[in-house]
């Protein structure tokens, strides 16, 4: 399936380049987007089946939605290979959905406080784009930062208004740990990027 996907994608790229005059930048963007969609879609199916089987499908959706929007706009650690990307995503999802909420219940006031710090960190050091993706311009960087800021801010608002309803406790814990782990990997990615630039 993967081999057939690559062949079809290469045919599409050749057609865009030869018949429609797409630039190298445009081709790089198309290739990155199509590859990302294929890889992400395959991971989502596997993760959905796994967490659904364990009875955590709703929590999975909460974590997934937050993680997808934050990763798309703010970025973070980008793995070179599918398997390492798969494993990293699994660790983040498993930790935020099952492991950490069972180990520690975080009070709503702490969720709001820590998420506010995470919101500022994401805005200040993001976005960190994949090296396989064309570098974003200043307008796109600002847009991504603002979007990431708004996503976490909306989560904070939800916690502020609905924390008294126990129905949402599980999802607030999952969302909180998802934001914290995303921010942690973003911070690690920033440090790694600085070290790469220093050694270049």
Regions found by a protein language model. Name each.
Residues 142-146, 155-200:
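Glycine-rich, aromatic-bearing surface loops/beta-hairpins
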Residues 67-78, 125-134, 187-190:
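C-terminal ends of transmembrane helices
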Residues 50-63, 109-116:
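Structural signature of hydrophobic alpha-helical transmembrane segments
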Residues 96-109, 150-167:
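Hydrophobic alpha-helical transmembrane segments in multi-pass integral membrane proteins
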Residues 11-59, 69-70:
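Hydrophobic transmembrane alpha-helices
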Residues 128-152:
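Membrane-helix boundary/juxtamembrane motif in polytopic membrane proteins
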Residues 72-88, 94-99:
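Interfacial aromatic-anchored transmembrane helix boundaries in multi-pass membrane proteins
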Residues 80-91, 109-115, 137-143:
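Cytoplasmic-side transmembrane-helix entry/capping segments in multi-pass membrane proteins
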């Amino acid at each position: 399936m993967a081999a057939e996907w690559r062949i079809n994608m290469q045919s599409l790229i050749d057609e865009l380049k030869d018949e429609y005059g797409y630039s190298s930048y445009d081709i790089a963007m198309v290739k990155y987007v199509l590859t990302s969609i294929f890889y992400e879609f395959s991971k989502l199916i596997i993760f959905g089946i796994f967490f659904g089987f364990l009875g955590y499908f709703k929590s999975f959706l909460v974590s997934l939605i937050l993680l997808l929007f934050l990763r798309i706009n703010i970025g973070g650690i980008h793995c070179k290979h599918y398997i390492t990307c798969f494993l990293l995503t699994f660790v983040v999802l498993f930790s935020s959905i099952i492991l950490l909420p069972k180990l520690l219940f975080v009070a709503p006031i702490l969720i709001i406080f820590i998420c506010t710090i995470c919101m500022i960190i994401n805005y200040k050091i993001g976005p960190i784009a994949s090296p396989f993706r064309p570098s974003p311009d200043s307008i796109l960087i600002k847009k991504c930062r603002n979007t990431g800021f708004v996503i976490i801010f909306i989560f904070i608002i939800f916690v502020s208004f609905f924390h008294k309803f126990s129905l949402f406790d599980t999802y607030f814990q999952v969302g909180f740990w998802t934001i914290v782990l995303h921010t942690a990997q973003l911070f690690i990615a920033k440090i790694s990027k600085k070290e790469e630039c220093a050694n270049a």
